[in-house]
């Protein structure tokens, strides 16, 4: 994946094949299955195949691993949304690609990490929360920039309200949508766009 390779080269996320990357990957699986509090450093070390003490060459404390999982997931999401609309000309397609990008964030490779971000938010310190919120605000600002720039063309009356409705509905899809069902992410993005703009679906959007 080009986005991942670029972020690794820029030092914004860990190489999944590196010791640090393997720790993050295995920890995310354990945190998702057992929860942050119930996962021990020994559990993580065993999953990675290293001694417990070796973890501390890469992370000072267990919470730093949790923060890294969340931080790297948000960075991937930011890069993905920016790439999604790059070169897109029409307002409708820009919004559709943003919706599609967010669905990919929820249901794609970053899905587990984004779920951890929500479920384990209270497990990190206030200072770490502030850093993550700064990253998250970057993501949201991009959304609002696209919506505001295209509000007239898309006949959007309230940009803030639309973003909140989209954010809530897209996030909730994690409870009912399955990738192996009858509707793929492209079709789901078409449905969400039609609902957001109160437009009838085009024939090609029908599964």
Model-derived features: positions:
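C-terminal peripheral helix-coil segments that are non-catalytic and often amphipathic
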Residues: 1-7, 104-108, 140-149, 160, ...
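Hydrophobic alpha-helical connector segments
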Residues: 68, 82-112, 162
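Amphipathic alpha-helical segments used for helix-helix packing
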Residues: 94, 107-127, 144, 175
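N-terminal intrinsically disordered/low-complexity leader segments
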Residues: 1-18, 25, 29, 88, ...
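Amphipathic alpha-helical packing segments from all-alpha helical-bundle domains
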Residues: 75-78, 116, 126-152, 160-164, ...
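Amphipathic alpha-helical interaction segments
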Residues: 22, 93-97, 101, 116, ...
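Helix-turn-helix
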Residues: 11, 22, 26-64, 68
